[in-house]
């Protein structure tokens, strides 16, 4: 079974559901509100575990009421939390508005995630024992870089989701095996709007790129082959929160199982398609049997 380590954020998502997202200065009435465990790191960990991997989470929660709930959610999905530490202060939160088309806008408050600025004893050994390391940018960049360099030193595949998008140091990109931005993040990193051109520009910095394109599917680019476009299943989206993390978690599992890249992307797209038909981030993530049924249908 593929062993995946995830170094990243754990947040409680505070989700308001509205008919139409408010404009600046506008107040609207929501139709529902929920607190849902999330955070890009935790989401990817849960997605990978439900997709069939052995998963370990490295990160931090606060000593508030949200911390134990997040830990319990991870463990219930099969994620090992021995390296998820509890620190003084609040757990990270994500304040999310979801409109009636399934689109969202998100503000993240780091909380305990801001304390994950270095690896602690035991983290390096965990990363070294994994088949892949999943990274995102909701924790301090120092820890992301330390994780990537540790993975490279031990021959562990590193998959980086550059979100929230920001300028990235060359040494982090040099330690990245696969970069998985969405089209907006790819444009932010390169200054190029067209995903094919943005992907080509990113290949100057990383060996392989998968750009997620929402309902349009995903695009794979590498230095030694033609670009590969893989469509997404056609579904009606209810809530797109966490869809990208679902894709990354499932993709990591498929690659760990040595599936060809086209099959791995299509399998991950099937997982993401299932997730957008349900509300919430981690709550929407499908199990392996569901992914297989969707993929083969």
Annotate each language-model stretch with its function.
Residues 1-60, 65-76, 236-238:
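Glycine-rich phosphate/adenosyl-contacting loop at the front of the ribokinase-like
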Residues 1-4, 167, 195-297:
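Conserved phosphate-binding/catalytic region of the ribokinase-like
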Residues 1-10, 68-86, 96-229:
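Ribokinase/PfkB-type carbohydrate-kinase core domain
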Residues 13, 187, 282:
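Nucleotide phosphate-binding site architecture
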Residues 22-30, 180-182, 228-231:
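Short glycine/proline- and charge-enriched loop/turn segments
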Residues 44, 136-138, 282:
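Glutamine-centric residue-chemistry signal
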Residues 48, 57, 70, 74, ...:
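Hydrophobic packing within well-folded, soluble alpha/beta domains
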Residues 89-92:
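Short acidic/glycine-enriched loop/turn segments that link adjacent beta-strands
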């Amino acid at each position: 079974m593929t062993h995946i380590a995830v170094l990243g954020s754990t947040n409680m998502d505070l989700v308001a559901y509205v008919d139409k997202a408010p404009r600046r200065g506008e107040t609207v009435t929501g139709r529902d509100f929920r607190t849902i465990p999330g955070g890009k790191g935790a989401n990817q960990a849960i997605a990978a575990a439900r997709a069939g991997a052995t998963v370990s989470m490295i990160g931090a929660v606060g000593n508030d009421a949200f911390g134990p709930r997040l830990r319990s959610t991870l463990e219930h999905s099969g994620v090992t939390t021995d390296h998820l530490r509890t620190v003084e202060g609040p757990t990270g939160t994500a304040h999310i508005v979801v409109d009636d088309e399934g689109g969202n806008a998100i503000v993240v408050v780091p909380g305990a995630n801001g304390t994950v600025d270095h690896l602690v004893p035991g983290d390096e050994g965990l990363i070294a024992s994994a088949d892949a390391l999943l990274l995102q940018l909701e924790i301090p960049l120092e820890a992301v870089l330390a994780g990537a360099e540790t993975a490279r030193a031990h021959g562990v595949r590193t998959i980086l989701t550059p979100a929230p998008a920001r300028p990235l140091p060359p040494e982090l990109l040099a330690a990245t095996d696969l970069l998985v931005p969405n089209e907006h993040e790819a444009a932010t990193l390169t200054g190029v709007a067209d995903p094919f051109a943005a992907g080509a520009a990113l290949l100057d910095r990383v060996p392989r790129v998968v750009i997620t394109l929402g309902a349009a599917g995903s695009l794979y680019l590498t230095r030694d082959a033609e670009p590969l476009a893989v469509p997404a299943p056609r579904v009606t989206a209810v809530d797109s929160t966490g869809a990208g993390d679902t894709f990354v978690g499932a993709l990591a599992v498929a690659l760990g199982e040595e599936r060809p890249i086209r099959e791995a992307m299509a399998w991950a797209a099937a997982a993401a398609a299932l997730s957008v038909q349900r509300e919430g981030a981690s709550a929407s993530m499908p199990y392996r049997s569901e992914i297989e049924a969707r993929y083969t249908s």
